[in-house]
Amino acid sequence: MRVKGGPTTRRRRKKWLNQAEGTFGTRHASYKVAKQTVIKSAKYAFRDRKNKKREFRALWIQRLNGALRELGVTYSVFINLLKKQQITINRKMLSEIAIHDHEAFKKLVKEVTGK
């Protein structure tokens, strides 16, 4: 007698359909399309977890450069001076200081540049 898989097949397909929940149209209803959608979304998620790091670093650098140029220093010069003086503070913290505590940032820039 031939076994078609009944409950096993249903459970497997249901798993894919549940993962595709919240998508529009056939993407959440059709097994074949839902499976393709979930696989593609996983690829995007993997790729974008890497891109997120790049994008945030670029954002911090842009913020720093803007804040530094107001004080008459460029980003590249400032980072170079920090490294020469062996000051280890990451770009994220520097940009947060520049945004939220501008006076402290000014003092830090004066200290590093000697102006």
UniProtKB/Swiss-Prot annotation:
Top-level taxon of the source organism:
Bacteria
Q: Which GO terms describe its cellular component?
A: ribonucleoprotein complex; ribosome
Q: Does the keyword RNA-binding apply?
A: yes
Keyword Cell inner membrane appears in the UniProt entry: no
Q: Which UniProt keywords apply?
A: Ribonucleoprotein, Ribosomal protein, RNA-binding, rRNA-binding
Give a GO molecular function annotation for the protein: rRNA binding
GO:BP terms for this protein? Answer: ribosomal large subunit assembly; translation
PANTHER family recorded for this chain? Answer: 39S RIBOSOMAL PROTEIN L20 (PTHR10986)
What task does this protein carry out? Binds directly to 23S ribosomal RNA and is necessary for the in vitro assembly process of the 50S ribosomal subunit. It is not involved in the protein synthesizing functions of that subunit.
Protein name (Swiss-Prot/TrEMBL): Large ribosomal subunit protein bL20
Name of the gene this protein is made from = rplT
